[in-house]
Amino acid sequence: QSFKNAEPGIKLCGREFIRAVIYTCGGSRWEGSPGMSSKCCTYGCTRKDISILC
């Protein structure tokens, strides 16, 4: 697979992660995923990664 066109991940920690999830999912309609917040903080997440929580 070629990752040249892949969306770059953005590191989101704490409040920034929660705000990104709420913005992407629309309000509080999202389910937690164990380890997702630490993954996004350490390695970065794409919009597609966050939309999995919706």
UniProtKB/Swiss-Prot annotation:
This is Relaxin. It comes from Squalus acanthias (Spiny dogfish). PROSITE patterns: INSULIN (PS00262). It is found in: Secreted. The modification Pyrrolidone carboxylic acid is found at Q1. Keywords: Disulfide bond, Hormone, Pyrrolidone carboxylic acid, Secreted. Belongs to the insulin family. Disulfide bonds join C13-C41, C25-C54, C40-C45. SMART domains: IlGF (SM00078). Pfam families: Ins_beta. GO terms for cellular component: extracellular region. The function of relaxin in an oviparous species is not yet known. GO terms for molecular function: G protein-coupled receptor binding; hormone activity. CDD domains: IlGF_relaxin_like (cd04365). Heterodimer of a B chain and an A chain linked by two disulfide bonds.
